[in-house]
Every structure is written in C-alpha cells, then in structure tokens.
Amino acid sequence: VPKVLLVSRFSWILIRRRSHSADTFVHLIGVTHPSPAKAAQFRAVDLVSIKVAAKAARDAGVRHFVYLSVAQPAPVMKAFLEVRRHGEELVRATGLSATFVRPCYVLGLGHRWPYPLLPFYWLAERLPWTRESARRLGLVTIRQMIRTLVWSIENPPNGVRILGVPEIRATTLSLPQNDRL
C-alpha cells in the first residue's frame, strides 16, 4: 500500500519534513469556485502552492506526484489554465514520475448547476465537428474523480501520465456506496 501525503499548507519546510515517508504526493490545493475574476488569486494560491509542493516533493525523494490540473486547451478561464499549465511544467521539471488529472468541471455537492447541460454534452459528443472538444471538456462526477485519484495513487506511472476527461470517466475502481457523492 503506497504511503500518501496530504497537506494544505504553503510551508516548504513542513511539507518537506512530512514528505520523507511518502511514496506519493497528491496536490489538491487551489482557489475555490474558480472564475475569470480570480486571476490574481490563482497566481497567489495555486501557483505558489505548486511551486512549494513540487520542490518539497523532489527534495524529500517522493517517487510519484499527482497534480489536479484542468482540461487543456479550454476556451475560458485563461488565467486558471495558464497557472495549471505552469504547475504541470514545474512538476515535470522535478524529474518525478507524475500523474496530471485534467477534469474540466466536477459535478458534486454544491456543484450541480451544469446538470441541465448534460443532454447538450451528450449530443456534442456524437457530432463529428464537436466530438473531440466535448469529450475533452466534458463533465465528470466527484465519484469519478475520487476513483481516478485513488487509482492514480495505487498505480504510479513510469514517467508522466495525463488523465483527461475520457480517462477519468473510464477509470474503474470499486468504491463504497455513499449517497452524498
């Protein structure tokens, strides 16, 4: 069973000290409810945290880094996309094996407004001229994300692995039933 480190601090020293016994570092830190109006927060929170985390994980000898990124390319949220892309570059530069998980939007508690759009996504995934974009920018559930993160931790890659929306949807792993997810 891999040893996993979950932290929510910006302290490189704290992260480095706690990372020594971990096999996998999972980075989930980011601004809540992203919107184009939060560009400065993306740089102050998301970018700073990934800089600290990537360096600390490398220095601590962690073997696998899991980074929650975002679907790329995407037509909106340019600052968010830019920060996440830069975060991926920082993780790649460490030389660690890495998994970049790239959802577009995660449906779950408090994030249900896009459900009425599901029929439009279904149609767009079937039309040849919109299929690729609709699949890359599709909606995933919190349950699919949890399955993907757990699977990523339990199956570290040799090198870099990118899991986009199609891969997130296809991840199979049994999870206990929980109606809240």
Question: Predicted regions span which residues?
Answer:
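NAD(P)H-binding glycine-rich loop region in Rossmannoid oxidoreductase-like domains
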Residues: V1-V52, A56-D59
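SDR active-site strand-loop-helix element
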Residues: L28-I29, F65-A71, V101-P103
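Active-site proximal helix/loop that lines the substrate pocket
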Residues: G30-H33, V70-P73, G108
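Short amphipathic alpha-helical segments at helix-loop
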Residues: P34-K38, A71-Q72, T130-S133
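Hydrophobic, well-structured mid-protein blocks that either form specific transmembrane helices
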Residues: Q41-L90
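Oxidoreductase cofactor-interface core, primarily capturing Rossmann-like NAD(P)-dependent enzymes
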Residues: A60, P75-P176
